[in-house]
Amino acid sequence: MFKRVGLIAGIAGPVAGSSRFSAVSFSKRAFSASSKRCTYEEERAVLDEIQPLLSEKDIDASKKLRNIGISAHIDSGKTTFTERVLYYTGRIKAIHEVRGRDNVGAKMDSMDLEREKGITIQSAATYCSWDKDNESYHFNLIDTPGHIDFTIEVERALRILDGAVLVVCAVSGVQSQTVTVDRQMRRYNVPRVTFINKMDRMGANPFRSIEQINNKLRIPAAAIQVPIGAESELKGVVNIIDRVAIYNEGSNGEKLVTGPVPEDLKDLVEEKRALLIETLADVDDEIAEIFLEEKEPSVDEIKAAIRRATIARKFSPVLMGSALANTGIQNVLDAIVEYLPNPSEVLNTGLDIAKDETKVNLIPSSTQPFVGLAFKLEEGKYGQLTYIRVYQGKMRKGGYITNVKTGKKVKISRLVRMHSNDMEDVDEVGAGEICATFGIDCSSGDTFTDGTLKYSMSSMFVPDAVISLSITPKSKDSTNFSKALNRFQKEDPTFRVRFDPESKETVISGMGELHLEIYVERMRREYNVECVTGKPQVSYRESIQSSAEFDYTHKKQSGGAGQYGRVMGNLSHIENSNTNNFETAIVGGRIPDKYLAACAKGFEEACEKGPLIGHRVLGVNMLINDGAIHAVDSNELAFKTATMAAFRQAFLESQPVILEPIMNVSVTSPNEFQGNVIGLMNKLQAVIQDTENGQDEFTITAECPLNTMFGFATSLRASTQGKGEFSLEFKHYAPASPQLQKQLIADYQKKQQQK
């Protein structure tokens, strides 16, 4: 595997590029799935050792490069923000809005569906340049979706980026998906600057949002700007570090004008500047020393401390403005240059498969052997488009790279930099760059090298699907139907397809109703396939609450070659686990290794379809510690069958339970509908966790069984006159109510009898 130091591999669902049984571990001793999280100080020590290995050319190229993602809660203004970035960096000549009247739409929303719905569905990459202090800096920029149903797009972007801009709404503050994005940034150790957007909106309060960032996200954050004016009177911002007022002028805010701090803001500027220094003193030793000596740090010392603390992921500087009002965006571009890391300041490591998976540090030098990660696939006009982050070495047009997983050597016939759905051909890209290429048959998460190295990379965390529905093409010609499903599965690891042998139906699974609805619509538009879908179904899980011993013999001997396999051991519950585990403790070789491997396969298959209702099994440990073989009749099939039967027997004796997905629900609505919304949540068996009352609207956060949430969007619209909005995110699995469990088991048994 390959991982950024500190990444904890996700085990909640199959990982892109891995087998479908990746959540099951097989070893002769208990398997530990967690990895040690390194501190930034440990990373820094390794980076200091790598630095002398870089040439001046490598260092210079790296210093001028930033790989940045734009992330936020839905409707916080990410895509509008990115549109301004493209305009001010000269990448586009005119600004178009997400829901523009000209029917053009924002550049980064290239799909028709995105422009129609006004949301980002796929992450989009672009490349632009920004000039600061007479130097030109190059940004690889990825705009990500804000809706939880498309969370894999955020995961795969943050997996390969070095820094991020977290966009927060000045009115709504930290919202449910903001918390999710924060968790994703921590998972991949991505430092961030924060931009408080929509400062021109009524009710905007940046300092309340900063307080929420500190309290809810638990990361020290402080303003480095204060607004000039408020709401519709927003005129600009004051840079409190330099004590300079900055105004956006021109038809699109393209001209920056500086001036003295307005008289009525001087006290606020000094107050927030003192708070900034105090916050930095808590996270940076050099500022702490100056602070304790009761001296005032210089401007350069403050900026250096912000950079150190931001890259160390101990602090986030907060800027503010309004993307829609063309205010404050250029300041964020300056902050990206000043405070976010370049590729040589981020430690990435890999495992050398040729040396028993020894950990190796990747060197961000273009003179080193090539190592890259395919992190995203798209079907383009010219075939499969594969996005690759280059960690080490170079990629050249006409050159060859090797897929470490398959061993297949492929030629790079075309190399491009992406600009949303447009592309620009390039001859080569170096370490730290992000590019795309055509004609490579691979999966998302595959590692590529120049063929001299056998380094392997881990893929991104892939959450488990929580909702399924049956899907059938209206036409008997299923060629395009199969093509679409195969393509979508390959592109999106959270989109799963299976054939149900009992109902004889194709079943698709994903992260939510919108997620699956989008794919059904894309089939119609892109493949001309009209589909009929069934009622959404919850992805339940089966588990146990106690343990049981087993001693099972599978015997089939009726003359000639037969089958014989005996397995003994126990089945037990793994507390708070999203995995299943198989282990052996055989003494004296009573069961040969080849039969134990068959036992592991039997366990994997048994976990795919539980005994209660045929859903996947979760949180179970199976130990085989004894058994017996027959000199003639024992074989792999016999031991696989014996293991599956032993599993079923012990499972039903271990207090089996059906688990249902519990969702984290966040509902925001005008205050006058609060009673209606609370009543609606109570009907859904929701447990309300928190209620926040704002000036005009309120937000309720609750935990609710997914089973009760179908049709919630319609109910919420009816209860709030169409003014309420909500977001759903999977929280955890919990035992379903006894009544629901009985009903599910009865329905399953009835289906089995009808077969």
Curated annotation (Swiss-Prot):
Residues 1-38 form a transit peptide. GO terms for cellular component: mitochondrion. Pathway: Protein biosynthesis; polypeptide chain elongation. Its main location: mitochondrion. It is found in: Mitochondrion. Keywords: Elongation factor, GTP-binding, Mitochondrion, Nucleotide-binding, Protein biosynthesis, Transit peptide. Residues 63-344 form the tr-type G domain. GO terms for biological process: mitochondrial translational elongation. The keyword Chloroplast does not apply. InterPro entries: EFG_II, EFG_III, EFG_III/V, EFG_IV, EFG_V, EFG_V-like, EFTu-like_2, G_TR_CS. GO terms for molecular function: GTP binding; GTPase activity; translation elongation factor activity. Belongs to the TRAFAC class translation factor GTPase superfamily. Classic translation factor GTPase family. EF-G/EF-2 subfamily. HAMAP family: EF_G_EF_2_B (MF_00054_B). Mitochondrial GTPase that catalyzes the GTP-dependent ribosomal translocation step during translation elongation. During this step, the ribosome changes from the pre-translocational (PRE) to the post-translocational (POST) state as the newly formed A-site-bound peptidyl-tRNA and P-site-bound deacylated tRNA move to the P and E sites, respectively. Catalyzes the coordinated movement of the two tRNA molecules, the mRNA and conformational changes in the ribosome. This is Elongation factor G, mitochondrial. The gene is MEF1.
